[in-house]
């Protein structure tokens, strides 16, 4: 970033475009690419953000080199199997050797999306990486190894808990109350972002 006025971002697991809308509300930021595995999400995002390149894909099934290099990687990995809102007991990320019960494929895939963050960051070496998820992600058994993997790539991090309904720095706050965790990574040696302003 170092003084550049052209800050680019990629929005992964983009949904309808709320994160993109937030990013482009910051002067100098543009979202170059957005991706999701669901065609309806891509259709909606494309309608809302026509100047962004859209890629319909399951990130685990494609190579990161298909995406443009950007300053920021924004990831909103699937949170269904981390969240208590699901209404079912969360499944452990590790399979017990003493149990015949195996986690469902959907649960494993949901948690595996967190590792797409590491894989894409390793390839693109973003200046900043933001990961938005539910607060329960902190109790995921592989949370610490996941953080350690990002540290091994040369990033420092800070964990921020925020209900977006109470955040209105750049405009109207979100119209719903949902607690979220934002794990913010920056390259070690670079100045840490100012999270207080």
Tell where the protein language model's regions lie, with residue ranges.
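S-adenosyl-L-methionine-dependent DNA methyltransferase catalytic core
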Residues: 1-31, 37, 41, 149-152, ...
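Generic enzyme active-site microenvironment
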Residues: 9, 34, 74, 130-131
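Generic detector of well-ordered alpha-helical packing
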Residues: 12, 37, 59, 133-134
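Alpha-helix termination/capping residues and helix-transition junctions
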Residues: 25-28, 48, 67, 123
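Conserved beta-strand segments of alpha/beta enzyme cores
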Residues: 30-33, 53, 156-158
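S-adenosyl-L-methionine
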Residues: 40-67
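Class I S-adenosyl-L-methionine
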Residues: 62-72, 82-197
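Short glycine-/small-residue-rich Rossmann-like dinucleotide-binding loops
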Residues: 77-78
């Amino acid at each position: 970033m170092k003084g550049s006025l052209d800050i680019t971002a990629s929005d992964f697991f983009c949904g309808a475009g709320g994160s993109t809308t937030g990013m482009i509300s910051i002067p100098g930021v543009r979202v170059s690419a957005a991706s999701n595995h669901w065609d309806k999400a891509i259709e909606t995002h494309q309608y809302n953000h026509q100047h962004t390149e859209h890629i319909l894909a399951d990130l685990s099934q494609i190579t990161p080199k298909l995406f443009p290099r950007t300053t920021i990687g924004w990831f909103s990995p699937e949170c269904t199997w981390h969240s208590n809102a699901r209404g079912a007991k969360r499944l452990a990320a590790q399979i017990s050797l003493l149990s015949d019960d195996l986690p469902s494929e959907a649960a494993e895939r949901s948690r595996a999306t967190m590792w797409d963050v590491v894989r894409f960051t390793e390839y693109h070496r973003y200046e900043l990486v933001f990961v938005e998820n539910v607060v329960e992600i902190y109790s995921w058994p592989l949370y610490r190894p996941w953080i350690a993997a990002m540290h091994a790539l040369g990033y420092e991090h800070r964990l921020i808990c925020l209900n977006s309904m109470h955040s209105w720095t750049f405009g109207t706050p979100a119209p719903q109350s949902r607690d979220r965790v934002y794990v913010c990574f920056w390259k070690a040696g670079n100045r840490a972002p100012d999270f207080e302003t």
